[in-house]
């Protein structure tokens, strides 16, 4: 099993190094969806688990009520909906099968279960983890690595996994050269654009949104300036 990780500086490189071992003969575009899909799965599972434990602690029996997750509010009182993750798709259910030859199929089924419970995600999540070309032993090692992140000691899992997601995107961009412009604009450029726009309120529209970096940076801008995220609407196409 992978060693415990502190998620300090260099954590993103460790994620990339471990994930890159899975590549084998998989096409670059499909490999990208595997790596980023796994990060997304861990993120929504962690966020669901935090809300789940909060509801359990309240002791009113609403921890399996989907509406409680859709109506979730953050500590600032703003709506912060949480995707409902069914039991078979929660990270703990996946982690116990990390060293099983069926780990790819288990992850694919988890993605399907999440799509079924969250119509907004229908036909969006990657479901190619069971393909023969993907090294299941390496996949299990990456699952272990994610499992062993001590989130409670190193801040919000959203920040940690967000860093990993952005770092992996940049590495894919490096590997794909000029073609990467189809899905990725360097974060420093997007951040500069957002600082010029100062999106405190109104609409943020990106006609070539790719991986959604403009929207992420806009949300971070509002948070950094103590604004209200509910004062903006984001629109994008690609």
Residue ranges and their predicted role:
Residues 1-200:
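Non-catalytic, mostly N-terminal accessory regions of nucleic-acid modification and defense proteins
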Residues 179-238:
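Conserved S-adenosyl-L-methionine
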């Amino acid at each position: 099993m992978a060693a415990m990780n502190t998620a300090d500086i260099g954590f993103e490189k460790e994620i990339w190094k471990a994930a890159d071992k899975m590549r084998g003969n998989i096409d670059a575009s499909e490999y990208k969806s595997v790596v980023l899909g796994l990060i997304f799965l861990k993120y929504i599972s962690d966020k669901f688990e935090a809300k789940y434990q909060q509801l359990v602690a309240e002791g009113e029996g609403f921890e399996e009520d989907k509406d409680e997750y859709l109506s979730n509010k953050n500590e600032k009182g703003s709506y912060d909906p949480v995707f409902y993750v069914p039991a078979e798709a929660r990270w703990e259910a996946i982690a116990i099968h990390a060293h099983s030859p069926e780990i790819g199929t288990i992850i694919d089924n988890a993605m399907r279960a999440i799509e079924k419970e969250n119509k907004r995600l229908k036909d969006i999540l990657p479901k190619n983890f069971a393909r023969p070309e993907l090294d299941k032993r390496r996949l299990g090692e990456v699952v272990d690595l994610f499992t062993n992140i001590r989130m409670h000691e190193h801040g919000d899992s959203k920040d940690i996994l967000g860093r990993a997601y952005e770092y992996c995107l940049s590495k894919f961009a490096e590997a794909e050269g000029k073609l990467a412009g189809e899905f990725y604009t360097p974060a420093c450029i997007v951040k500069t654009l957002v600082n010029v726009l100062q999106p405190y309120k109104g609409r943020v529209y990106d006609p070539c949104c790719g991986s959604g970096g403009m929207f992420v940076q806009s949300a971070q801008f509002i948070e950094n300036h103590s604004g209200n995220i509910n004062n903006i609407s984001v629109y994008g196409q690609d």
